């Protein structure tokens, strides 16, 4: 006698009926809810109404695919489905799917309400949790804004309407070296030169003060000369041997100009670069078919500048420069009001000359006001400039090599007035401010954090090339 027989209240083997040897004895029909084994113990107890239904059944038909008997009901009679859990699979049936018919009963819970509850819970979690990033950077991480621009909408840069004509390809590869067995640094990045970084920061700080509508009038130029100590009367000596930024402007001044020998040698240096470029084009025309025909765009000019000091009521005095183009007949007059914004001295004791980086406004004067200024005022200074300009587009630089004649009046022994011409030589490098402002905007917007400093380094490198050239000449 097994456990199933005990649970089903079967009689002991001694109480069984005879005819065992025939094997044809039939047991009475058992309800589908009788517990035949331990597995059936897992099933729910049979409802009373289902047991009563069995008594009202009329006909039975035998299923052709199984030994179970399927009850046949009346056409209009419907039986409630009975879910049986006869296996572990049925027990873990979370959706209450009838295995025999594979039908799924609808879930009473409204899914839309459940989704809304989930969204509400997620929104609450987002509002209570700490954000991953600051909506506003802490004070130590915020960008410095000048006092004049605080409280304005200058935080978002306005990109210049005129796009750059240069590509965004990197000029200086600061992450690799030529030799495969060497690395540029322990971090894999070459640190920027300290002098170049300081110059770029100085330009950046001044550019933030310039309104967008005034950008087209900005001029940024490097001039060759020497930093003179006012007390000693000669070039400064601050016990340094390399290039540096000199900030003590109170006791010094910048003596602009170069020697004639050095000026001629720098002009020859630019001419030699142009000749070498032309020779390279002739040697390999096919390889350089897409290259420009000239390395530099060279322009000669002959300009006479007259400076006027204009004073108006309730206004500060203005220095007006009226330029006369002597190469045109009749000559053409243009006038500007030049205002210097800031200057930076770059001292290099190992080179022949120092540099002064000047940032200025060049506001144009209307042509109809020029005649009135000339007739009503006397010039305070006259300069005749015979200039050769080399414009090198790939380095966004224009080289101005100028021979300046300054008329000087004097009297001879007999008292007769004599006009003499003092001659001087000047070297200026002017950067394309449009390209520099484009790099400035890209840096502020985060689109390109390298372009701005890269342009500054290119510009300063051009000045270093000329300075090194004339220094070699002096050391011979």
From Swiss-Prot:
Query: Organism source for this protein?
Result: Debaryomyces hansenii (strain ATCC 36239 / CBS 767 / BCRC 21394 / JCM 1990 / NBRC 0083 / IGC 2968)
Which segments show compositional bias classed as Basic residues?
123-132
Q: Which UniProt keywords apply?
A: Hydrolase, mRNA capping, mRNA processing, Nucleus
**Where is the protein localized?**
Nucleus
The answer on whether this UniProt entry bears the keyword Transport reads no
UniProt GO cellular component terms: mRNA capping enzyme complex
Task: Assign the protein's first listed, main location to one coarse class.
Answer: nucleus
> What's the domain of life for this entry?
Eukaryota
Query: Which cofactors does this protein require?
Result: Mg(2+)
Which reaction(s) are listed as its catalytic activity? Answer: a 5'-end triphospho-ribonucleoside in mRNA + H2O = a 5'-end diphospho-ribonucleoside in mRNA + phosphate + H(+)
Q: Give EC number(s), comma-separated.
A: 3.6.1.74
Any idea which GO molecular function terms this record carries?
mRNA 5'-triphosphate monophosphatase activity; polynucleotide 5'-phosphatase activity
- Pfam families for the chain: mRNA_triPase
Region described as Disordered: 1-133
Tell me the InterPro entries matching this sequence: Cet1/Ctl1, CYTH-like_dom_sf, mRNA_triPase_Cet1, mRNA_triPase_Cet1_sf
Q: Biased-composition ranges for Basic and acidic residues?
A: 51-67, 105-114
Q: What top-tier enzyme class does this entry carry?
A: hydrolase
Describe the family membership recorded for this protein in Swiss-Prot or TrEMBL: Belongs to the fungal TPase family.
Q: How does it assemble?
A: Heterodimer. The mRNA-capping enzyme is composed of two separate chains alpha and beta, respectively a mRNA guanylyltransferase and an mRNA 5'-triphosphate monophosphatase.
Instruction: Quote the function comment for this protein.
Output: First step of mRNA capping. Converts the 5'-triphosphate end of a nascent mRNA chain into a diphosphate end.
Example GO biological process: 7-methylguanosine mRNA capping
The protein's name in its UniProt record: mRNA-capping enzyme subunit beta
